[in-house]
Amino acid sequence: MRKIIVGSRKSKLALTQTNWFIDQLQALGLPYEFEVKEIVTKGDVILDVTLSKVGGKGLFVKEIEHALLTKEIDMAVHSMKDMPAVLPAGLTIGCIPKRVDPRDAFISKNGKSFKELAKGATLGTSSLRRSAQLLAARPDLQVKWIRGNIDTRLRKLQEENYDAIILATAGLKRMGWDNDVITEHLDESLCVPAVGQGALAIECREDDKDLLQLLAHMNDAATERTVAAERVFLHKLEGGCQVPIAGYATLQENGKIKLHALVGSTDGSVLLKETVVGTNPETVGLEAAERLIHQGAKELISAANKEQQ
């Protein structure tokens, strides 16, 4: 019986996601056993500055990918939104399980909705994507950066100078929080989700054919296609955490992919949006990127990158 070593960040959410996925694999009843190896990433250590200022995407995966390449671990369970658009040589995404709710969750201290927040209220987020879109809708709001795990952020909302915070619905659901803390789910028309939000990425070595065969049982074809369109879009624009960039694709009844794509200025004064429908994920992602580039997305990305230096 082969033992598969599964790498995970030490956070409660990461371990919950990893153990959930291992449970799904064990339910297949195949001759494998699993062991979790906890790994500390740079993003877990640096908590006093915004992600955009310390390297953005990849902060939560680099050390784990190193462990994969050196064969300390055999696979890793990531939040797809933490994954850079390009993987290191020798690694691949072995499967993408079915996506859960991709929306952002708005949580206020007093139960007021986003529209009902008082003028000048303080909103806590560590995401340029969220802050740009919400400032575009409510320029009167004050954005204050907030870091830490889900429990820490919920505690900070109650104890510190925040009127509301934004978190990913998927993470809250996986941790057992949901309607008991969420004031409202933000519709994509107000806040387009991050590329890959709500999906998991199971990463492994591309030469591990045995493991790839096992992971294929857990792949969700619809999620794979929609996330592929989002990631092609992200890759073409070379966007990371340093840039307000968003992409969310859905599969329509006719089998076509519909991608909502957005690039903004960091202050939310400019939001460029495109919606593209098509059959091929790569074509859809590239077209969305090209249309936004035509609108001036590259200039916004360049300006955002300069601001973070």
Curated annotation (Swiss-Prot):
<dbReference type="InterPro" id="IPR022417">
    <property type="entry name" value="Porphobilin_deaminase_N"/>
</dbReference>
<keyword id="KW-0808">Transferase</keyword>
<dbReference type="InterPro" id="IPR036803">
    <property type="entry name" value="Porphobilinogen_deaminase_C_sf"/>
</dbReference>
<comment type="subunit">
    <text>Monomer.</text>
</comment>
<protein>
    <recommendedName>
        <fullName>Porphobilinogen deaminase</fullName>
        <ecNumber>2.5.1.61</ecNumber>
    </recommendedName>
</protein>
<comment type="similarity">
    <text>Belongs to the HMBS family.</text>
</comment>
<dbReference type="GO" id="GO:0004418">
    <property type="term" value="F:hydroxymethylbilane synthase activity"/>
</dbReference>
<dbReference type="GO" id="GO:0006782">
    <property type="term" value="P:protoporphyrinogen IX biosynthetic process"/>
</dbReference>
<dbReference type="GO" id="GO:0005737">
    <property type="term" value="C:cytoplasm"/>
</dbReference>
<comment type="function">
    <text>Tetrapolymerization of the monopyrrole PBG into the hydroxymethylbilane pre-uroporphyrinogen in several discrete steps.</text>
</comment>
<dbReference type="InterPro" id="IPR022419">
    <property type="entry name" value="Porphobilin_deaminase_cofac_BS"/>
</dbReference>
<keyword id="KW-0627">Porphyrin biosynthesis</keyword>
<dbReference type="Pfam" id="PF01379">
    <property type="entry name" value="Porphobil_deam"/>
</dbReference>
<dbReference type="InterPro" id="IPR000860">
    <property type="entry name" value="HemC"/>
</dbReference>
<dbReference type="Pfam" id="PF03900">
    <property type="entry name" value="Porphobil_deamC"/>
</dbReference>
<comment type="pathway">
    <text>Porphyrin-containing compound metabolism; protoporphyrin-IX biosynthesis; coproporphyrinogen-III from 5-aminolevulinate: step 2/4.</text>
</comment>
<feature type="modified residue" description="S-(dipyrrolylmethanemethyl)cysteine">
    <location>
        <position position="241"/>
    </location>
</feature>
<dbReference type="InterPro" id="IPR022418">
    <property type="entry name" value="Porphobilinogen_deaminase_C"/>
</dbReference>
